[in-house]
């Protein structure tokens, strides 16, 4: 009987401590609900406070922060799942987002845009899963993700921003879908050793720019040159294939 009482007492103490930790995140402006701390009266997520390391952002929320210092008891995030209709509005620099343990990101169908500097500098990120609904990958979205070695881009993607995948370690083949019409300069700067690149056949020549190149300091063994680039004299390719205008390469 004493043993049962002792076990119940220990369980009660543990439960009480857990409740205290959760309550500690709630104050006049913050409330804890499940694995997240929210700004009171809103759907704004301020922090992940879960203990598994698998962070799944609920639908119809605004993501303002994930790892502030006051959420010190939360497990480091190793997998991040973004559901449909999530407004990603994080401050990347500083204490609000520290994702140095993050290895995998899965973005669900329905999300249409990857914002500026979304996961810049996540140097343990190895895998990203993008939905077919993604239309825009903004500037520096995955730059400096030094362990990211594979990338699958789906039909439906329209625009890739400046330095979007710079300083990654991509290898093998890279397919840039024919739905892509805009790819900003230096999108794939210093991003590994690529065997074969399929460039979108619908990339638009931006004649207002003095130069337009996408792969500086990236080694490429084989690449197609889209018909849209044949008369684009300010278009250059860098890397193993050398620096030459499209007109000169054809």
Can you annotate each of these PLM segments?
Residues 35, 50-64, 75-88, 98-113, ...:
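Structural signature of tandem-repeat unit edges
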Residues 1-9:
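Positively charged n-region of N-terminal signal peptides that target proteins for export
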Residues 30-51:
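GGW-centered surface loops in extracellular recognition modules
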Residues 69-75:
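Short, basic/hydrophobic alpha-helical segments
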Residues 8-16:
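Bacterial N-terminal signal peptides
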Residues 70, 93-95, 115-118, 138-141, ...:
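Consensus positions within tandem repeat domains that build extended binding/scaffold surfaces
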Residues 205-213:
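Intrinsically disordered, low-complexity Ser/Thr- and acidic-rich flexible linkers and loops
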Residues 15-29:
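Sec-dependent signal peptide cleavage junction
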């Amino acid at each position: 009987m004493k043993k049962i009482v002792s076990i119940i007492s220990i369980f009660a103490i543990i439960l009480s401590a857990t409740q205290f930790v959760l309550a500690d995140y709630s104050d006049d402006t913050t409330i804890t609900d499940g694995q997240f701390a929210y700004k009171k009266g809103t759907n704004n997520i301020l922090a992940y406070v879960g203990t598994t390391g698998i962070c799944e952002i609920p639908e119809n929320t605004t993501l303002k922060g994930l790892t502030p210092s006051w959420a010190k008891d939360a497990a480091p995030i190793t997998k991040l799942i973004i559901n449909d209709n999530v407004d990603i509005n994080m401050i990347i620099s500083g204490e609000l987002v520290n994702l140095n343990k993050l290895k995998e990101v899965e973005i669900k169908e329905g999300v249409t845009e990857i914002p500026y500097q979304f996961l810049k500098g996540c140097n343990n990120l190895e895998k990203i899963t993008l939905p077919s609904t993604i239309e825009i990958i903004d500037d520096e979205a995955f730059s400096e993700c030094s362990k990211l070695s594979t990338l699958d881009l789906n039909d439906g993607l329209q625009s890739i921003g400046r330095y979007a995948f710079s300083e990654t370690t991509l290898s093998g083949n890279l397919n840039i879908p024919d739905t892509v019409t805009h790819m900003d300069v230096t999108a794939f700067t210093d991003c590994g050793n690529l065997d074969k690149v399929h460039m979108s056949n619908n990339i638009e020549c931006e004649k207002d720019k003095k130069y337009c190149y996408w792969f500086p300091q990236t080694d490429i063994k084989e690449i197609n040159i889209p018909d849209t680039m044949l008369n684009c004299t300010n278009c250059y390719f860098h890397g193993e294939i050398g620096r030459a205008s499209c007109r000169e390469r054809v």
